[in-house]
């Protein structure tokens, strides 16, 4: 009967979308955040995330903006929130052999043959609402903070300098986040950060970043309410490089995530600077 069919549909959608809390944006660095802009949002204690992305090379360091990569490269990562105040991640970005290079064997030219490895850390310095209800959460973070200065040897370089340095994603930041809930509609997150970019083969900068996200929280058991509640929409203004690749500028990025099963399986997509598409998928497990 149609009544029974409606019951089964509600049960199915409840299992598919139910049980979700406010979804944290998953940055393309493989850490919690917006799309590229840092935030102070933390995952639940003992959360493990596994994911991968298809990345337009224009959003990366100039190292990837070469003919071998157009239009995309890829990354994959594992991320763990060890404590409520500490998140760590290990990310690998695929690398191709460079045409005409004496470093890369000829059979690797133009083929994915290696990967750039990077570590990422986020430390919560202040929890949202600790002092007053209006006080934001504060996080200190680092992406790809250190690498050997000479192609795997030599001293550790923390700043993206040296010809043999592989710090292609290096940046440091201080971020603050505040959430405002609209009952029966959703939750807005407001995020500001100061970002110091020191990536190898890229422009260096010390600039602010800002963004907002909106996670639907519609009341009701209908199909559309449950479907909408999977969306976490994002917009940000983030430091980056201009199209000449040598000038620091800002990019306006829009995108979001969509949870297709109880926050365990999530999709992410963005338009960087309104024209460069990247997308990915990540899986989330709560071990506690």
Where are these regions (language model features)?
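Short, small-residue-biased leader/transition segments that mark boundaries at the very start
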Residues: 1-8
């Amino acid at each position: 009967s149609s009544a029974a069919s409606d019951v089964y549909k509600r049960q199915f959608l409840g299992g598919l979308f139910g049980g979700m809390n406010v979804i944290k944006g998953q940055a393309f660095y493989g850490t919690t955040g917006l799309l590229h802009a840092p935030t102070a949002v933390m995952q639940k204690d003992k959360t493990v995330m596994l994911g991968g992305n298809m990345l337009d090379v224009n959003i990366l360091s100039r190292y990837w903006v070469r003919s071998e990569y157009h239009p995309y490269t890829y990354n994959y990562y594992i991320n763990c929130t060890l404590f409520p105040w500490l998140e760590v991640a290990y990310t690998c970005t695929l690398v191709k052999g460079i045409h005409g290079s004496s470093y890369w064997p000829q059979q690797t030219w133009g083929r994915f043959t290696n990967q750039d490895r990077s570590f990422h850390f986020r430390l919560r310095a202040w929890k949202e609402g600790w002092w007053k209800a209006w006080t934001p959460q504060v996080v200190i973070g680092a992406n790809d903070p250190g690498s050997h200065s000479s192609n795997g040897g030599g001293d550790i370089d923390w700043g993206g300098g040296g010809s043999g340095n592989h710090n292609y994603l290096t940046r440091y930041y201080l971020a603050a986040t505040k959430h405002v809930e609209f009952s029966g509609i959703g939750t807005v997150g407001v995020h500001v950060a100061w970002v110091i970019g020191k990536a190898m083969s890229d422009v260096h900068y010390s600039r602010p970043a800002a963004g907002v996200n909106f996670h639907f929280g519609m009341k009701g058991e209908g199909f559309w309410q449950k479907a909408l509640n999977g969306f976490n929409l994002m917009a940000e203004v983030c430091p980056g490089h201009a199209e000449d690749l040598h000038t620091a500028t800002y990019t306006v990025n829009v995108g979001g995530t969509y949870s297709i099963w109880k926050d365990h399986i999530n999709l992410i997509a963005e338009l960087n600077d309104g024209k460069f598409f990247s997308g990915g998928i990540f899986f989330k497990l709560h071990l506690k």
